[in-house]
Amino acid sequence: MAARDATSGSLSEESSALDLPSACDIRDYVLQGPSQEANSEAFSSLEFHSFPYSSDVDPDTSNLNIEQNNSWTAENFWLDPAVKGQSEKEEDDGLRKSLDRFYEMFGHPQPGSANSLSASVCKCLSQKITQLRGQESQKYALRSFQMARVIFNRDGCSVLQRHSRDTHFYPLEEGSTSLDDEKPNPGLSKDITHFLLQQNVMKDL
């Protein structure tokens, strides 16, 4: 009987010793447990965020991507040679029409003007302008004649009077001054003056 009790007590002690963790096991668990849990949580979080669903996309980020795409599209639109060329052509056409309105408005004698020379010069220039209008190769000449008409209408025809052989209003020395040696008038081409003198417009004085 005593031997059975002793054996039973020995087995109970061994069972208790086997069930309880050792001090080393407890220490290892304390040191490794939190790290393993953190790594497990981080891995789970990484797996969760690696493949977001479409409903989880930030709307602000989506809007930013749309704005960037729109900006890229707009930049490529203006860099397109065909679009750029069309825009420049429309701008040139608008500028040309504005210049035409300006020259027509200020290139004719004012109502009530009694200056017959200005009227004669204006008529001569207007005829030449009509001939040049619509000729792509004569754009510069057209603008030169239009500007000359504005200047003569504004400042008078003293330049022509100084160089005309028919004028009697200037001394011979001044009238014989070479046109090429004279200081040029801003906006007035000497070629236009030569053209008018060859047309003999001074006879209408």
From Swiss-Prot:
Any Pfam family matching the protein: SHLD1_C
Domain of life: Eukaryota
Keywords: Chromosome, DNA damage, DNA repair
Cellular compartment(s): Chromosome
Disulfide-bonded cysteines: none
GO biological process: DNA repair; negative regulation of double-strand break repair via homologous recombination; positive regulation of double-strand break repair via nonhomologous end joining; positive regulation of isotype switching; somatic diversification of immunoglobulins involved in immune response; telomere maintenance in response to DNA damage
GO cellular component: chromatin; chromosome; site of double-strand break
Main location class: nucleus
Signal peptide segment: none
Functional note: Component of the shieldin complex, which plays an important role in repair of DNA double-stranded breaks (DSBs). During G1 and S phase of the cell cycle, the complex functions downstream of TP53BP1 to promote non-homologous end joining (NHEJ) and suppress DNA end resection. Mediates various NHEJ-dependent processes including immunoglobulin class-switch recombination, and fusion of unprotected telomeres.
Subunit: Component of the shieldin complex, consisting of SHLD1, SHLD2, SHLD3 and MAD2L2/REV7. Within the complex, SHLD2 forms a scaffold which interacts with a SHLD3-MAD2L2 subcomplex via its N-terminus, and with SHLD1 via its C-terminus. Interacts with ASTE1.
Note: In BRCA1-deficient cells, function of the shieldin complex is necessary for sensitivity to the PARP inhibitor olaparib.
Protein name: Shieldin complex subunit 1
Species per Swiss-Prot/TrEMBL record: Homo sapiens (Human)
Top-level taxonomy: Eukaryota, Metazoa, Chordata, Craniata, Vertebrata
